[in-house]
């Protein structure tokens, strides 16, 4: 049985065991090495093709484990484990994340191993693309399956390093166990540096490039830069250095505020801020994709999509921190440009309500929407039992009020009634939809310039260069919030302000949960939703990492060590 599973592992988890298995035709290794220019385009398209399937679970395991979204209720779908933190090794979405990632690594590695460098700038560039994809995938793997870098990286395990098809794949195959977190990071760095060296041709954001490698290196080194309280200044400086290369290249520019509010609608070719994305096109995006793709869970657009996940109350509160964003169609006012990616589903009759979040018990919060009447300065609302309440103004201009409800004072807003899914108002998320105005078409963003400024801001702060950090932080903040820049930044507030801006800016790009834990912070999800609202997930929790898929362990030709199954197995130092 183990022999059968080993062959299955070779064929599935490490696809491309020989070149005939690669997409786009059957080509022998001899044909490719003798005339690489005739075949490389098709072969590399095969590498990029793996990313299209891989990027779906990549998004879900990165975003759903954070605090930017909530779901309408419990679900039998495997992704609910990401939300609930009920980790199991038998999860088909994590299996796809693993399988298609290793397929991409295997195909990229086989091309690297077959083609000699130095034949032409075009061939070297294509080899660089392969190195980029491999390095990027190893990094995405190690942050999902490995502990945060500041936690004993030479002891904790990353992922297996398998660069190409082993010689004896159909014989007595043996592969080494998982490399350490540090070794996996070094593999990613070496690949990305090689990619940076080889790539000299920029084919646009849908393809790997020198800048894409530099952008990813800025993030990798940032992940290695320790916490704000105990920074690793060597890696923080390297994060600055690689961010400088991207920013100073002049090849990318931040979109204007007006255009940034439409960021999701631009194709990669028409977006000056995008550095590398996993390109999707309408012709390959079926009706099925509009429901089961990432955007389909966040919204129903034109009758397409489930629309069962919404912006969390915590994220909405962050958006409203500097002034209320009013989404009502006849009073539309966006204070924070990031609020343009949120679309409440207002009821057609535009019934005025007072909406607030009330505490139902010590551990459960929920939304309330009470019918409201505004008569000059006098505002009242009525609950479902017919009890009337007079509201106290906090800001009449922004229509923010307080209510004394069941002996507790709550703050809320006058708004139109938002349609409910079960008991939750539908704050649809459109950041992963509407590319080219095509319903839920979306090319997942891997790197864009906005992130690079924030990478550099954080790295500067960890180096104690707070003036430089403030400049970068405000570059991003003031793009979204006119006049919203901070006056000062120092050791007392840098971590909180920079992390808050990363949350606002990079929401729904699969970054949030990793950002929280890599800086040693807890994840607090005290907001309405079916998750355990009272549970604070610490950075030391064993559930910070995902389990290695059990099928991968069963099929692995050698020992493949599982992650800890409780906190007693976690190594912190």
PLM feature spans:
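Sec-dependent bacterial lipoprotein signal peptides
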Residues: 1-15
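Membrane-proximal, proline-rich intrinsically disordered regions
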Residues: 4, 17-63, 346, 484, ...
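Aromatic-residue-lined binding/catalytic grooves and analogous aromatic/hydrophobic interfacial grooves
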Residues: 18-19, 199, 211-259, 274-275, ...
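Conserved, well-structured interaction surfaces
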Residues: 79-146, 175-183, 192-203, 439-444
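Short coil/turn linking the two alpha-helices of tandem helical-hairpin repeats
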Residues: 119, 142-149, 203, 220-232, ...
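"A position-specific structural signal for the A-helix of alpha-solenoid helical repeats
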Residues: 126, 133, 140, 216, ...
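Elongated scaffold/linker segments in the mid-to-C-terminal portions of large proteins
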Residues: 255-453, 460-462, 520-573
């Amino acid at each position: 049985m183990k022999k059968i599973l080993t062959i299955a592992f070779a064929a599935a988890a490490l696809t491309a065991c020989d070149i005939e298995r690669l997409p786009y035709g059957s080509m022998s290794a001899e044909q490719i090495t003798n005339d690489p220019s005739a075949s490389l385009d098709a072969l590399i398209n095969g590498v990029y093709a793996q990313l299209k399937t891989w990027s779906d679970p990549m998004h879900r395991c990165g975003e759903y484990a954070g605090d930017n979204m909530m779901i309408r209720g419990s679900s039998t779908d495997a992704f609910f484990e990401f939300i609930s933190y009920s980790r199991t090794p038998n999860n088909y979405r994590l299996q796809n994340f693993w399988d298609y990632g290793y397929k991409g690594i295997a195909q990229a590695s086989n091309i690297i191993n077959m083609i000699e460098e130095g034949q032409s700038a075009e061939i070297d560039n294509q080899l660089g693309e392969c190195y980029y994809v491999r390095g990027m995938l190893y990094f995405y793997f190690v942050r999902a399956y490995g502990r945060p870098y500041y936690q004993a990286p030479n002891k904790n395990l990353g992922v297996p390093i398998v660069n190409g098809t082993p010689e004896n794949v159909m014989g007595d195959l043996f592969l080494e166990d998982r490399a350490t977190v540090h070794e996996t990071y070094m593999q990613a760095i070496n690949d990305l540096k090689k990619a940076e060296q080889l790539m000299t041709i920029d084919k646009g954001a849908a393809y790997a490039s020198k800048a894409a490698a530099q952008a990813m290196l800025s993030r990798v080194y940032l992940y290695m830069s320790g916490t704000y309280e105990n920074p690793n200044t060597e890696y923080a400086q390297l994060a600055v250095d690689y961010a400088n290369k991207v920013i100073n290249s002049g090849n990318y520019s931040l979109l204007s505020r007006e255009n940034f509010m439409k960021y999701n609608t631009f194709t990669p070719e028409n977006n000056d801020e995008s550095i590398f994305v996993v390109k999707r096109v309408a012709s390959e995006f079926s009706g099925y994709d509009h429901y089961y793709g990432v955007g389909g869970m966040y919204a129903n657009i034109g009758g397409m999509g489930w629309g069962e996940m919404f912006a969390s109350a915590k994220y909405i509160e962050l958006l409203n921190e500097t002034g209320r964003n009013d989404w009502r169609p006849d009073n539309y006012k966006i204070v924070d440009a990031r609020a343009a990616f949120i679309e409440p589903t207002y009821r057609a009759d535009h019934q005025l309500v007072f909406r607030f979040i009330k505490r139902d018990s010590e551990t459960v919060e929920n939304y309330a929407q009470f019918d409201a009447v505004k008569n000059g300065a006098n505002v009242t609302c009525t609950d479902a039992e017919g009890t009337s309440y007079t509201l106290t103004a906090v800001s009449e201009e922004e229509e923010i009020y307080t209510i004394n409800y069941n002996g507790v004072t709550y703050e809320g807003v006058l708004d139109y009634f938002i349609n409910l899914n079960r008991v939750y108002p539908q704050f649809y998320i459109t950041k992963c939809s509407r590319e080219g105005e095509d319903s839920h078409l979306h090319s997942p963003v891997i790197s864009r310039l906005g992130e690079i400024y924030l990478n550099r801001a954080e790295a500067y702060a960890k180096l104690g260069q707070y003036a430089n950090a403030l400049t970068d932080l405000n570059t991003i903040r003031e793009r979204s919030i006119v006049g919203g820049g901070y006056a000062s930044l120092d050791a007392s507030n840098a971590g909180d302000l920079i992390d808050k801006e990363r949350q606002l800016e990079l929401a729904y790009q699969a970054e949030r949960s990793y950002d929280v834990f890599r800086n040693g912070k807890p994840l607090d999800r005290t907001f309405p939703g079916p998750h355990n609202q009272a549970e604070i997930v610490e950075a030391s929790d064993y559930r910070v990492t995902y389990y290695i898929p059990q099928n991968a362990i069963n099929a692995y030709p050698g020992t493949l060590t599982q992650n800890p199954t409780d906190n007693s197995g976690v190594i912190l130092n």
